[in-house]
Amino acid sequence: MLPWFLNHHKQIFDHGVMIDYHSTDRSVEIIREICPTWDIVTSRNQDFQADNIDTEVMDIERDLDGWKIALNVTEQMIGDYSLLDSIEPTQLLLPTLFMVDTDRENIVSHERPLYEQKFHGFSFRDSQRDFLERRARSIHNVSVYYPPTNTPECMGPGRHYHNYNTDKLVILYYGWCPFDQGGIVRKLQIQTQIPLIDRQRGWGFHHITNKETLTYRLENEFIPRSRDLTEEIQQYVTKHKDLSNIL
């Protein structure tokens, strides 16, 4: 997932900060290969305690000027980047297209963007339920506060917002696509770093799972809700190609 994330966002942003949660794979090497000028920050957190992660993100953002957005590697921002020409203090809340792997036999390649290989899922436009499945992300040129508990504006911890204020920029969410061995391993690894305190507070429960449960959710919860999003995705891809620095 990391190569797709990096190759996409290096076309949009002049700089990035990647937080390394003590990875033991080739993640750091891949970042240095694809985005050699980006910063790699080793997380001060030893596990995935959700509120501590959000505090660390806020501290990093505080030292950055201009527009900033905190994303997971399963998320790709895409659309009309001219919105980011504004110098007025602004916070944009971006809704999600939730991508679902409905054709697992279709093997994907890192040589092409995911939006050219996978086309099914559901959209924030489909229903309130579908929007809430993956709430909005914030891109902002002002300081924002990520609350440690749920508020009327933001689901905390986790940095997801309950509403969106533009549909010209969106997030393509690939947490369930592609649903191959790599994707399954990534989803199963998360639970090994969720601390006891988060489990006691009921945080991150959706990460406590196994391969059978993940497969059941994909086949019975997400695939039945999915449709062909090609036309909707293409509108954002066209804007992306018009306005990004595609190499």
Q: Residue spans of the language-model regions?
A:
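Short, well-formed alpha-helical segments that are part of the catalytic scaffolds
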Residues: 1-14
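A generic structural signal for alpha->beta connector loops
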Residues: 13, 37-40, 168
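Short beta-strand/loop segment that forms part of the nucleotide-sugar
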Residues: 14-22, 42-43
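Catalytic-site signature of metal-activated, phosphate-bearing donor transferases
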Residues: 50-62, 70, 77-247
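Ser/Thr-glycine-rich phosphate-binding loops at phosphate-binding pockets of nucleotides
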Residues: 8, 19-27
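Active-site-proximal specificity loops/subdomain of glycosyltransferases
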Residues: 4, 26-71, 79
